[in-house]
Amino acid sequence: MVLLYTPKQKTKNVQTITADILDLDYQGLGVAKINGKTWFIENALPHEKVECRILEDKRQYGHAIVKKWRVKSPERLEPKCAHFMRCGGCQGQHIPIEMQRKAKESALFKRLSKLQSEPISFQPMICGDAWAYRRRVRLSLWFNPSTKQIEMGFRQKNTNDLIPVQSCEVAEPAINYLLPKLTALLEKFSAPKQLGHIELVAADNGVAMLLRYTKNLAEIDRTLLLKFAEQEKLMLFLQSDKGIEQIYGDAPYYQFSDGIKLHFDIRDFIQVNSALNEPMVNTALDWLELSQQDCVLDLFCGMGNFTLPLAKRVKSAVGIEGVFEMVQKAAQNAERNQIKNIEFFQADLDQSFVEQPWANQSFNKILLDPPRSGAAFALNALCELKAEKILYVSCNPATLVRDAEILCNFGYKIEKSAVIDMFPHTGHLESITLFTTK
């Protein structure tokens, strides 16, 4: 008889630390110092003493998550959502909103103040309701082989597992109204395994819904969807490998208080927080101190969210966008709103654009709203235009600091800045910053 030796698998030791929480960073993580190293700890608040499981241990910093509280902060809140700490959407429901906002303002102040000796005028935060603010949600769909039912919900944090949901505390009421109705609808589908995901967007003229499916949709299911769209007055879109088709309703749009309407397609980027979009746009235009003598360049303009409102205040406006379809939509939006002093061009702003016709025009003011990667390449060329004011809307403090340093090296100074609390209960830090010539 042959004896086979099977080595025992080594169990991985779970490393733990005990920490006194000193501060809160803008992402909602508790900050501790242990033997000179900074630790960022999930689900921890200042003045708490916690036992933590180490998630990441680097030379200069570490990342951990609370296992047990020895001392809890009296300011800690009970999360409103039953799925908090499992769903990947919110990170800060246990943190008072005033504490969240103070941490974000402190982070912006510390980062920008290091770039120049001149004082910066930090303005009051642009903020709104902390709940029911999201006008767009994406819902994953999964056929559960055990129950033979389709499940709808959000992805669990750091996994592909699905958490079924019937409501979301940060979604707009029009979206929450539909969630239980959608669950009931999906149970009637003849081929639920073919369904991929659902997107809901609360436009100003109703809710738009996109259903992604992977194989041909049965006619009975298509009829079911059409009846649902008619009943709930939805704008209904279907997406397959062949593309997106709208099968019911009008084109979605949102509207500014001055009457400007921006039409968009269901998958187009729009600001998720509808209540803060117009205050953000108005702040940008006010800080630029626009007049009928100004020629303004708007970079990363999308479908004209900033460009159309500013064009009504200036002599001329030019919008630059990398995606051709968005350039077309921006031009169509300008035409619909009868705004004639505006032009749109397609350009990859991460590539040289000095040969393009718009790059040789004269602009005395510039506005840019880049993606998270920032605008480093574009700024090196744009500074040669010597605009008197540059307004930068940022969704990433790291690239904002990098790009602000470029502008400061070209002779600009930071005049004023403010946080935009676009995503309460999350670690996202949006901001708006005005640069002027020294």
UniProtKB/Swiss-Prot annotation:
Single GO BP term: rRNA base methylation
PROSITE patterns: SAM_MT_RNA_M5U, TRAM, TRMA_1, TRMA_2
Residues annotated to bind S-adenosyl-L-methionine: Q271, F300, N305, E321, D348, D369
UniProt domain TRAM: residue ranges: 10-68
Keywords: 4Fe-4S, Iron, Iron-sulfur, Metal-binding, Methyltransferase, rRNA processing, S-adenosyl-L-methionine, Transferase
Binding site for [4Fe-4S] cluster: C81, C87, C90, C168
The keyword Metal-binding belongs to this UniProt entry's keyword annotation: yes
UniProt-listed Enzyme Commission number(s): 2.1.1.190
Gene3D superfamilies the record matches: 2.40.50.1070, Nucleic acid-binding proteins (2.40.50.140), Vaccinia Virus protein VP39 (3.40.50.150)
Broad class of enzyme this protein falls into: transferase
HAMAP family reported in the protein's UniProt record: 23SrRNA_methyltr_RlmD
Role according to the record: Catalyzes the formation of 5-methyl-uridine at position 1939 (m5U1939) in 23S rRNA.
Protein name (database record): 23S rRNA (uracil(1939)-C(5))-methyltransferase RlmD
Gene expressing this chain: rlmD
